[in-house]
Regions:
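Short, solvent-exposed loop/turn segments at the edges of extracellular beta-sandwich modules
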Residues: 1-3, 91-98
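C-terminal edge beta-strand
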Residues: 7-14, 101-111
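Proline-enriched interdomain boundary motifs that mark the N-terminal boundary
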Residues: 17-24, 113-120
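Short, solvent-exposed loop/linker segments at the N-terminal edge
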Residues: 27-33, 122-128
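A short beta-strand segment in extracellular, disulfide-stabilized domains
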Residues: 33-41, 128-137
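Solvent-exposed loop segments of extracellular immunoglobulin-like
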Residues: 45-54, 139-151
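Exposed beta-strand face motif in extracellular beta-rich ectodomains
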Residues: 80-86
Length: 175
């Protein structure tokens, strides 16, 4: 004789691992504000928290934190762009069980302050064409040079702009 008891029913909940939606990279210039980084997830029926690390604190962002990353004033006092890798780790919690998901990186690039090296004053003959050299010590990108001329009788374009790493603006000057 075998005695069989009444069956019982119980539920097993299988939580997903933590997941974070893709975060876009940011590119800002020295002294300008980044945009708020709001982390989100596709997971439901629980709570997802986010922790993050920053591998380059010199940009003005702490080495680590939790939750969203507020806007901050980016710092780059050098002459090259700097790139910080921010790595966010999601943790899904439900029913007292935490499930950590894979870490996901994104980048914040901080460009240096734009600068132009001084050009020398020039004396030219009426009607001569002249190259005006522009250069910068900044590297790793393209600089845009913009000028304003307050004396249009020289023949130099009143305003202008060109984008190059190192360039010469070519103008014919008249008096």
């Amino acid at each position: 004789d075998t005695n069989v008891g009444d069956p019982i029913t119980f539920e097993i909940t299988v939580n997903p691992t933590g997941q974070v939606n893709s975060v876009g990279n940011q590119i800002v210039s020295n002294g300008f504000d980044t945009t708020l980084v709001e982390f989100s997830t596709a997971n439901i029926n629980g709570t997802t928290t986010f922790s993050w690390t920053n591998d380059l604190t010199s940009i003005g962002l702490a080495a680590s934190g939790t939750g969203n990353i507020p806007a901050f004033t980016a710092i780059n006092t050098g002459t090259n762009p700097v790139i910080a890798t921010i790595t966010v780790t999601p943790t899904f919690e439900n029913g007292g069980v935490s499930c950590t998901g894979p870490a996901t990186p994104f980048e914040i690039t901080v460009n240096p302050t734009a600068q132009v090296n001084p050009t020398v004053d020039m004396v030219v003959t009426d009607g001569d064409s002249v190259d005006i050299p522009f250069s910068t010590i900044n590297t790793g990108g393209t600089s845009t040079y913009t000028w304003t001329n307050t004396d249009p009788t020289t023949g130099l374009t009143n305003t202008g702009s060109v984008s190059y790493t190192h360039l010469r603006a070519h103008e014919t000057l008249d008096n």
